[in-house]
Amino acid sequence: MSNYKNFINYFKRSDETATLGLGMLVSGLILFWLGWSIYWIFFYIGVPLIPIGFALYIYGTTGRADENELKKIIQENTDAITFEDVKNSAEFRKRIPNSPTEESFGEYVFNTNVLMKKTKSGSVISSEYVCAKMLILNDAFLVRTYAFSFVANKTQKSEIEIPFASVEKIEMEHVNKRYMLNNKELATKASALVITHDGVKTRLPRKDDIYADEFVLKLNRLIKINE
């Protein structure tokens, strides 16, 4: 990914700029027509609105990415995390179930070092993202993560194997935080699957949907079966 500037513009420019520009452009054209055909004063009101509105619209829509591009990159990076090397490895052959299960995770990263934006849908996103996948073995969880930035050449890969025997607890964690953006307070909610093992906690970002609790129960049952 090399178009960092477009993503910087996406996070820094307001979505309302293009909307305002389009509104001014349309209003200017209508007033221009009214001034030409009905009353001259509308002409002089509409004429300056046209170039200003056009400039704002161009500024708000060009040279910047959009939400669909973010989603595309997220999907590409998530798909790039695979376990084909593990599945084809003689070392892991006996530890992989006949029908291995893979689970995907991912969420935007929120801290004071990222750019944040409130989307048109009302959700809050940031300029950094972490995606992960978990391969459930017969005796352990194998987790691979990939964290990256939309606005800079910043990436980080990691891998951890968590033996079932070392797991103390699996649960969902919810954290509410507030940040300031353009003098406005933004509320964010981060959810994660937390696996406590060997006295440490491994957090995998996961949306708190209707399947979250069911997934936690599934993993806990798996741990008990293999005790």
Please describe what each predicted stretch is:
Residues 14-18, 223-226:
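Short, flexible helical or helix-coil boundary motifs
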Residues 24-26:
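Alpha-helical transmembrane segments
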Residues 77-78, 87-96, 138, 171-174, ...:
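Hydrophobic, Leu/Ile/Phe/Ala-enriched alpha-helical segments that form helix-helix packing faces
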Residues 154-227:
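Acidic, Ser/Thr- and proline-rich intrinsically disordered linker/docking segments
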